[in-house]
Curated annotation (Swiss-Prot):
Signal peptide span: none
Biased composition (Polar residues): 542-561
GO MF terms held by the record: potassium ion transmembrane transporter activity; sodium:proton antiporter activity
Topology relative to the membrane: Multi-pass membrane protein
Assigned GO CC terms: plasma membrane
The protein, known as: Na(+)/H(+) antiporter 2
Subcellular location: Membrane
Membrane-spanning ranges: 12-32, 36-56, 70-90, 105-125, 128-148, 174-194, 203-223, 244-264, 267-287, 294-314, 319-339, 361-381, 409-429, 432-452
GO biological process, one term: regulation of membrane potential
Keywords: Antiport, Glycoprotein, Ion transport, Membrane, Sodium, Sodium transport, Transmembrane, Transmembrane helix, Transport
Length: 808
């Protein structure tokens, strides 16, 4: 060139191409993903095709050297990082709680997809025998964790239920490693035909026992040691924040290195290492607000799919010499999209606990993207076939030509895999399935704090709740609108604690009222309730006019109410999210009859203002010990896992999840009858319980428009929740009890719900309330045993300071 400063190299051009694409796409990424519904993998692959050797030839990785070797190692690193990240982000002890669902997706569903693809490859591609077709099917059977991120993370994830996101994440992270047994079984059948003993010995002893089982154990050891090491370093304050956040990336590289050196399944090593590393949820809680992993994943995805788009074998997609034609590949792609997973998942839906409806089964069956994992499996298979033909290091730079043993298999495996990947990128990367699922889901985010949109700040709605301002005062909560479902002679009210019985008894008092007022309707209680409501409206109207000089707009309600309705300003205005959260929590509280201990209520603190010590629960006896602090942290995590976060409806059911995507309640409404149809409340860890028909209003709220408002106010000791039209959804009576009891301090998940209606939850509750939660006594024992092991690696200052940071 004229000037030596302008001389460029291939590497410099590659850096520029990847950098330009990443910069431009990052600037419009939200528009592309939200408005065009296109994922970054599709756009990056198209860009790689344009600048690659097939179009502009600016970016040509085929001229860098051994392309297969480069692609294999890049795919290995990307997969190990992504698989480790997926396992770390799962809820704590996820594999222990959901192993049935994960196993059903990994074993029967993968096996079915493998056999179906192999059958159609054998039919469509001439010249390939069935073992070779099994090898083709094994390469494109696994679900890719990189492409699955378009559903399990980001803005698209808000349209998918949390339990489905967790299930897809776990499956995509684990089945890439479990594709290795299918690959090597196919290789053994292809390389050792008619030698059953050799096939069984190699597959069981080498593939299953060494590569898979020992690889999983090795991953657990690496993850466990890494967890202990980072907790020790953090407890001694010898690790900085940057290294703390990057530590899991370092562990992922460690898994890739040791797995490759020992000849085990490095993807399984990475997955189980991440699972063991984040088993107790401590690391996830520490890095909850950090997005370092997401940033690194995005950069790697941009670069990888630009690279992949530039090396696609476009000429081989229509190459009759190796038995491939475009129409054959199109038919095979349709089989992969529609028959690989959907029939198996639909048929096994009753056996998968985490799939609650046929629509969810259809979504899980459809969303099985093929991507980086298929590239890794295809090049690994090709390398193994080449190793039986030469003593050179594999994979080879050039594929053996016609006449070599298994030459057609080695020539077809890469084009078939790449065509399947591009089809999956187009279908799954566009996220059409996610958008369609979101149209049928009516979701509502549950918040634990009031919105604070009251217009009369002088009379906060906390002040209008029952006067339970004495700390430690017991109370009972009873639903007044609940239809009687108990047999005569049983107690009619279900309370949260001690039953408050009047001196004369409820029936005697009622008979006395009937005798004294025979000409008056028997619903005296409701008349008093209406009088109290009218008095609130009257007083609020006066206070509103005095303080603001304005009235609310005419809402046009019925039921004989005033047209202006200025009394609304005194009520607490809540949206439908908070209404669902309040009703859900208070119904659960009112129906709890197994716990006979009395709760203590404290309404001295304004709701919405959290104390930095709210998440720290201490015992009076051993509050300063390290073991107690660790147990308190675990109890705090368990409490957070029981807080309702989102509810959504699907067909005739309401599913309530926590922030981690775990299902708290599963409410199914049977539509067989009109008014007397019974409802069932199902929980995957609890037996079936009956609920009253008024709970169907929860189903109604979640299906309403998001702009609807609801009102919560107090009339005497009654807590009322109603909508804009005046329909009362719930009435609760909070009955204070006499006397006090000393109760050991513990926690209950209904605290956040009580806080949302102005009642600060008891600082004390019997520990037997934990039996009501999803966790069993065995899990609690495991948590406590695990906390005792972690005590040895922490000093008295470290855990306390870290726990305080977590509480903040």
């Amino acid at each position: 060139m004229a000037w030596s400063q302008l001389e460029v190299t291939k590497a410099h051009v590659a850096y520029s191409c990847v950098g330009i694409f990443s910069s431009i796409f990052s600037l419009v990424s939200l528009f592309v993903k939200e408005q065009l519904y296109i994922g970054e993998s599709m756009v990056a692959s198209i860009f790689g095709l344009i600048v690659g050797p097939h179009c502009l030839n600016w970016f040509n990785p085929l001229s860098w050297g051994n392309t297969d070797s480069i692609t294999l190692e890049i795919s290995r690193i990307l997969l190990c990082l992504q698989v480790f990240a997926v396992s770390v982000e799962l809820p704590r002890k996820y594999m222990l709680k959901h192993w049935v669902s994960v196993t059903m997706l990994l074993v029967p569903v993968m096996t079915s997809g493998w056999l179906v693809i192999a059958l159609f490859v054998w039919i469509l591609v001439p010249g390939l025998n069935f073992p070779a077709s099994l090898l083709m099917g094994a390469c494109i059977t696994a679900t890719d964790p990189v492409l699955a991120q378009s559903v399990v993370s980001g803005t698209f994830a808000q349209k998918v239920p949390g339990h489905l996101r967790n299930l897809l994440s776990c499956e995509s992270g684990c089945n890439d490693g479990l594709a290795i047994p299918f690959v090597f079984l196919s290789l053994d059948l292809l390389l050792y035909p008619g030698r059953g003993g050799q096939i069984v010995k190699d597959w069981i002893c080498v593939t299953i026992l060494w590569e898979c089982i020992f690889g999983s154990i090795l991953g657990c050891i690496i993850g466990y040691c890494g967890r202990k090491a980072i907790r020790f370093a953090e407890g001694r304050h010898i690790i900085d924040r940057e290294s703390f956040l990057a530590f899991y990336l370092i562990l992922a590289l460690t898994c890739a290195g040791f797995g490759s050196m020992l000849g085990v399944d490095d993807l399984l090593v990475s997955f189980f290492a991440g699972t063991a590393f984040a088993w107790d949820g401590w690391f996830a809680a520490k890095t909850h607000e950090s997005n370092v992993s997401n940033v690194i994943d995005v950069l790697l995805n941009y670069a990888y799919f630009v690279y992949l788009g530039s090396i696609l074998p476009w000429k081989d997609f229509n190459n009759p010499d190796i038995g491939l034609d475009v129409w054959r590949l199109i038919l095979l792609s349709l089989v992969v999209i529609f028959l690989r997973r959907i029939p198996a998942v639909l048929s096994l839906k009753p056996l998968i606990p985490d799939i609650k409806s046929w629509r969810e089964a259809m979504f899980i069956g459809h969303f099985g993207p093929i991507g980086v994992g298929a590239v890794f499996a295809a090049i690994t298979s090709k390398s193994q076939l080449e190793s039986h033909l030469t003593n050179e290091e594999t994979p080879l730079k050039d594929t053996p030509g016609r006449g070599s043993k298994h030459w057609q298999v080695m020539a077809c495996i890469w084009p078939i895999t790449c065509f399947s990947i591009m089809t999956s990128v187009i279908v799954h990367g566009s996220s059409v399935a996610v958008i369609m699922l979101g149209r049928y889901l009516s979701t509502v985010t549950l918040m634990a704090l009031p919105t604070g949109r009251t217009t009369n700040t002088k009379n906060a709605w906390l002040e209008r709740l029952p006067a339970l301002d004495k700390s430690g005062r017991p109370f009972s909560l009873q639903r007044l609108d609940k239809e009687p479902s108990l047999s005569p002679g049983q107690i009619g009210g279900r309370t949260s604690g001690m039953v408050a019985t009047p001196k004369l008894g409820m029936r005697q008092r009622w008979r006395q009222k009937l005798q004294d007022n025979k000409e008056i309707e028997p619903d005296i209680e409701m008349n008093n309730f209406c009088q109290g409501t009218f008095q609130i409206r009257k007083e609020t109207h006066a206070s509103t006019n005095d303080s603001h000089g304005t009235t609310t707009a005419n809402l046009g309600t019925s039921n004989g109410r005033a047209q202006g309705l200025p009394w609304r300003s005194k009520m607490n205005i809540i949206d439908r999210a908070e209404a669902v959260n309040t009703i859900y929590g208070l119904d659960k509280l009112a129906e709890d009859t197994e716990n006979k201990d009395v709760w203590r209520v404290n309404t001295s603190r304004i709701p919405g203002i959290r104390s930095p010590y709210d998440d720290v629960y201490t015992y009076q006896s051993d509050s300063s010990s390290i073991g107690s602090i660790e147990r308190q942290r675990i109890k705090s995590l368990r409490e957070q896992e029981q807080q309702a976060y989102i509810a959504y409806t699907e067909d005739d059911q309401v599913i309530i999840e926590n922030r981690q995507g775990e299902i708290l309640e599963y409410v199914k409404f049977h539509k067989e009858g009109l008014g007397d149809a019974e409802s069932g409340l199902h929980n995957h860890d609890r037996p079936k319980r009956a609920i009253s028909p008024p709970l169907e209003k929860l189903h109604q709220i979640t299906n309403e428009a998001r702009k609807n408002k609801y009102y919560a106010y107090k009339v005497g000791n009654d807590l009322v929740i109603e909508d804009e039209s005046g329909e009362v959804f719930r009435r609760y009576r909070i009955s204070p009890h006499g006397g006090k009891r000393k109760i050991k301090k513990i926690i209950n998940p209904v605290s956040s719900v009580l806080s949302s209606v102005g009642i600060t939850k008891p600082r004390g509750v019997s520990e037997r309330i934990n039996h009501y939660l999803l966790h069993s006594e065995d899990e609690m024992a495991d948590d406590e045993a695990e906390s005792e092991n972690d005590m040895d690696y922490e000093d008295s200052d470290g855990p306390a300071s870290r726990f305080k940071d977590h509480a903040d």
